[in-house]
Amino acid sequence: MEKIRVKEIFDNVYSVDFGDGLKRIATKSLVPGKRVYGEKLVYSDSIEYRIWNPNKSKLGAAIINGLKKMPIKKGEKVLYLGASAGTTPSHVADIAENSLVYALEFAPRIMREFIDSCNERKNLIPVLGDANRPQDYSNIVEKVDVIFEDVAQPNQAEILVKNAKWFLKENGYAMISIKARSVDVTKNPREIFAEQKKILIEGGFEIVDEVNIEPFEKDHMMMVGIWKGN
C-alpha cells in the first residue's frame, strides 16, 4: 500500500501527498469501495479517499489552481446545475456528507448514466429539468445554502441569478464555471468574464473569488459570489 500524507484544506476536502511533488486533492469516500468515474482510491489511517481528477472536474481544477473561498461544506444543502454523468456531484456529495445535493441535468440519457454511477450516494438527489426554468423543479428543490453551476449556455450568468431567486438562502453562496466560448466565440474571453461578472453583480451577487482554471479547461473562469438578492 502506498504511503501518503493527507491534510484537510477545506471542509471535507484534502490534499494528498505521494511524495512526488504533484498537487493532488481528494474527498473522503461516502460509499467506500465505489468508484464513479474510474478515480483512484487511496487509504490513510483506515480511511478511504477518492482522488479528485482536475482534468474531469472544473471545481477540482479551481481548487488545484488556488481557490480561496470554498462554500460547499459538511451539512450545507447544495443545488448543482449541470450534473452531467456525476463526476463532480459525487465529490460534492462526499463533502456535504449528511446533507442533500440536488443534481439537475437536462438530458435524459446523461441522467440515466448519472443515476447508474451515483445511485448509492443517498444524499445525491437526481432532478431532470432545464436550468432555465427553475419553476419546473421548485416542487422538488428546497432552499439551499449553495448553488453550483456548470451549464454551457450563452446566458450562464442569467441562469444562476434566476435559480438564486428561487432557491438560494439570503447570504448563501454560488459558484459558477463560466465557459467563455459558450457565451460568444468571437469575443476575447477576458471581456466575456467581465460581462458575466457584471450580470451577476447587477443580479444580486457580491463576487468574492475568481479563479482561472487553465490548463485544465481553456477559457474558463470559476467565480464565487454571496447572494444579496435584489
UniProtKB/Swiss-Prot annotation:
It holds the Pfam family Fibrillarin. One of its GO terms (biological process) is box C/D sno(s)RNA 3'-end processing. S-adenosyl-L-methionine binds at T87, T88, E105, F106, D130, A131, D150, V151, A152, Q153. Keywords: Methyltransferase, RNA-binding, rRNA processing, Transferase, tRNA processing. It comes from the Archaea. PROSITE patterns: FIBRILLARIN. One of its GO terms (molecular function) is RNA binding. It is an enzyme of class 2 (transferase). Interacts with nop5. Component of box C/D small ribonucleoprotein (sRNP) particles that contain rpl7ae, FlpA and nop5, plus a guide RNA. HAMAP family: RNA_methyltransf_FlpA. Involved in pre-rRNA and tRNA processing. Utilizes the methyl donor S-adenosyl-L-methionine to catalyze the site-specific 2'-hydroxyl methylation of ribose moieties in rRNA and tRNA. Site specificity is provided by a guide RNA that base pairs with the substrate. Methylation occurs at a characteristic distance from the sequence involved in base pairing with the guide RNA. Belongs to the methyltransferase superfamily. Fibrillarin family. This is Fibrillarin-like rRNA/tRNA 2'-O-methyltransferase. It comes from Methanococcus maripaludis (strain DSM 14266 / JCM 13030 / NBRC 101832 / S2 / LL). The gene is flpA.
